[in-house]
Structure formats: structure tokens, C-alpha cells
Amino acid sequence: MQESLEPEAGIGEELIEPKAEESRVPGSGRNIYDILYGNIGKKASYPALIYYGRRVTYFQLISAVDSFAAELESRFKIKKGDRIAISLPNSPQFIISFFAIVKIGAVMVPLNTGQNAANFVKKLEILHIKGIVTHSQGYTLLKDAVTEGMFVIVTRVQDFMPFEKASRITFFDSTWGKVKWGGNVYPFSDFMFGSEGSGNPVNPDDDVAIIQLTGVSLPNLQAVSLTHSNIISALRQASDVFTITGKRSIVACATPFSVPYAYLFGFLLPMGAGHPVLVFHDNHDSKTIAKLCRKTGADIMVAHPRIYSKLLFNKKTSKHLKKISIYISGTDTMSGSLASAIVDNLKGKLLQIYGFSETSGISHYRWVDDSGQPANTIGFPFKETSCKIIDQTTGEEVKVGEKGELLVNGPQSARKYLFTLIGEEDNFAGAWFHTGNIVMRNQEGSYILIEKLRDIIISDAIPVFPNEIEAVINKFPEVSESAVIGISDGNLGESIKAFVVTKDGTASCQRKLIKYLNENLAEYQRPHFYEFRNELPKSMSGKIIKRILIEQAAGRTEENTASVK
């Protein structure tokens, strides 16, 4: 990158110490951009981002955001309500694009980076995307998808890294040279030195800031519209539960910024208090994550169970996390042994967040001070969040200790789906969001998750629909039928397991099937385990009974199961 964004201090050097203060959450009548801009005064010279040793100050970050926003308006005539997609790994470029888009009243659409080309192309069409910010590796997915009038801004993961680190990555990365520049394709660096611009005033209660996908791939594409007010309300409630008070706290985020939990706790909450965020472009590289946490002195971590498992159950990585005092976990419940590794072994504080994309990523929380608590406890509703549990048959509220469907209502909740699956239009009934989760409430007012009714697997923080995977498996010539379920994979959270019935009744096609699925499924959709069977359990009507498969998978040794590493 250009010289103006060179770091002020190298990795391991002293940070300028900001004064401890509570998070500055803007009022409900404000733009999300105000969360960042509040640091332009006293904290302009403090680090906002740390990216593999490079420090970007709040002044530099705000300048980059303002420039990017002004260029979007002047070059592409972006106006309020236009939709711009971000398909990037965690990086400074993601955060710059995020704030620039919402500043001018446009709509940010986060898209997962690990998907196949056909899925990506169709998604851009359905969402009516005006432009997209992506990286050079992702450019190959959409080079043939760009329609007339759609612009593409391309960056590299190594931009914003220190020169030596960036040079090593560039040496092995050939994707930048394959980008066809010109026309409507532009390098990200061209947008860093424009004018400041003015932004557009927003009506926070009505103007959409983010279109959040709740079903991320075809044919199960779902989305909700989250307003500026929804996000700021979620942030306000989050800050009631957790306030960063340390003078030089550094928040490390190892969950994709494309999910609400991650952008809420991973950078909006820290930046609301003027603290730096430690960013990793590869959230699966646990060795590098751990070492950077140690070198920078990060003391707060935002991640999800699968990442925590990789970090904490490996002595080579866990030894680097001794300075982490607070662990925040979201997107799924955490196993008892994983909670014990944090609370008992590392003596850290553990905050578990539970929520839905439809509720801006939050509905419940719990501070885990006893690793012996049931692992499926999701905790208490946030301060401004109302919950009730109803009998699915009568619709009446159930008594304490009885099971029923969880309904959620709060200022962070979306009003309706932008588009959705047939049969789920009524999930927003009146002011209440029907979660599809069966829960119970104990005498203390804490909620316990019993069962998820919706056929969705949360794999590595991303919602996955089993029927999408089954459709691809069943197209393989040697397969007769299949069933895909989510299984508890120890401390890793949910893993994807495929039960396959072949036409010849054997597993001889296993290698070819896995190769076929790797070519036709997005990375996050690929099964972790396979089990080949002669038949699948079915009802009298011939419908596969997945409940039996789930029970069998939970209670058996995996003697007939192939694991894919």
C-alpha cells in the first residue's frame, strides 16, 4: 500500500495508551458510521487496526473510509439504497468498505468468500448488486458474472501488511496478474486518496444498512434487511453486557466479519470504545493467530467454538493465549470441556453470545463462571430483548420448566424477510420472530436450548442447508439416495455428516464422490464425515427420518464412517 498508511509502530512495540472509557454507542437516530467517526478527536493517533504487524491509526482508517465513500459517490453515482457486496476475508479492506458503504446510505451485503462460481453468479443477480468489493482470488468467481453497470473493486489480502510479509505472499500469489483491469474493474488502492465527501443523512429506523443472508446459498437463499437502528440497538445492548475498560485492551477477532456476531463484537464494539482490533485474514490458521495474540498482547478474543477448539486443545497454540483474559464465543453453543479449558485451565472469563441473523446476531448471553453448567444453556435475554416460549400446537405461553418454541422481539430485530423460503414467511408474526428453536426457561430465568426445528447446520459459523448438499450428492451417477445431518463433533461444534446409499450397495465410489463434491460444493458445504449404508430409515410414506440418523450418529462408534481431513 501507499506510504501514508505505513504503521507507526512495529509488532510488539508499545501502543499509545488510550484512557479507559465506556463504549460510545451513538444514539438511535444516528448512522453506523458515527461509531467510527467518534474517534477522530482525542483518539485519532491511536491504533484502530493491527494486521500482521501493521498498525493503522484511527485517523488513517477514517481518512481511508471517507475517501472510499466519496469515490463511490463520484465515480459510480452510488445513492442511498444501492446495494454493494463485500466478498472479502477479514481484513482492513473489509472494515473500510463496510463503513464507507453505510456512511453514504448505501446497503452493505456481506457474501461468504468460499463458494462456487455458479452459486455466486446467481446470488449477485437475485440481490440486484450494483457493485462488489472482492480480493484477487475471489475475482475468478465473478469475472464472467459482472453485468453492464456493475463495478468490481479488487484488492489483495497482503495489502496493508508490512512490506516483508506482503512480499512473501506476493511471490506465491499469481491471481493479481490474472485480473483483467479496465472497463468496470478497479484496484482498491485507487480509492484511497479521494476527497472527504459528505455522506448522506439516513433515517435510521427505516433506511437499510445491511442485507444479511440467513440462508447463504441456492436454492435456500434467505435475507433480512437490518437498519442502522437495528445494528445500533444491538450494539447498545451488547455494551450493557460487556464494556471494554482496559487502558490498552486489544480485541482479536477470529470469526468471519460476514456474520452479525463478528462485526458486532469483532470491530463495532471495540471501535466504539476507541480500542484496536487484531485482524486475521485466515481464521483457520490457529498457529499464526495464537502467535500474533501473544506478540501484540491481545487480551480479548472474539471467536466461535470450532476456532477455540483448535486453539485451546493444542499445547503449541494454547501457550500463547495466557494474556487473553476474556473469551467471547458466538454462533453456536459450546461444549462443557471447551468451556472448562477456558474457565478452569486458563482462568479466563467466558462470555457466550446466542442469537440469529434476524436479530442482528444477539438475543441471549451468559457469563460462564462454572464450566459445569449445561452446555446447551443459552442464558438470559439482552436488556431490551423480550422473549416468550409458546406451545407449538396452541400458541399459548408455557409455564416455567416446560418446553416450547422460542419467540424473540427487540429493537435489534428485523421486521420481515427480504425474500425467503416457502413456508417460512410467517416466522415474523406481528412483532415476534419465531426462531424455530425449542427451549425451556428455568426458575432463575435462564434459557436452555432443547432442539432446533429448522433443518440447518451451523458449520464454522456459517448456516448450511442439508438439502443443498443432498441435491448435489444425489446427482452423482453411482448414488441412489442420501441424507445429510449436523452432528456434534466434540468441541468443534457441528460437523456435516452424509449418509449415502449407492446403487451397488458398496462404498467403492467414495474417492470419486468426494472429488466430485469438492468440485461442486462450496468449501463450507463439504461433508466432514461419510457413512455408506444399504438403506436409510424411512416413514410409511417413504420420507427419510433424519431424527433416527441423528440419534444413531450420537450413540455409535464410527466404525463405518469415513472422516475427511
Task: Describe the function of each predicted region.
Residues T155, L521-I544, A562-K565:
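AMP-binding/adenylate-forming catalytic domain of the ANL superfamily
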Residues W176, A298-A303, L312-Q373, S386:
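Gly/Ser/Thr-rich phosphate-binding loop
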Residues I232-I250, S258-I300:
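Conserved AMP-binding/adenylation subdomain of ANL enzymes
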Residues F380-E384, E396-D426, I462-V464:
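Conserved ATP/PPi-binding loop(s) of AMP-dependent carboxylate-activating enzymes
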Residues W176-L213, N220, T243-I250:
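Conserved pre-ATP/AMP-binding loop-to-beta segment of ANL
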Residues Q115, K122-K123, I132-S136, G410, ...:
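AMP-binding/adenylate-forming catalytic core of the ANL superfamily
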Residues T57-F59, N200-P201, A209-R236:
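Conserved AMP-binding A3 loop
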Residues S28, S45-K79, A85, P89-S91, ...:
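Conserved AMP-binding/adenylate-forming core of the ANL superfamily
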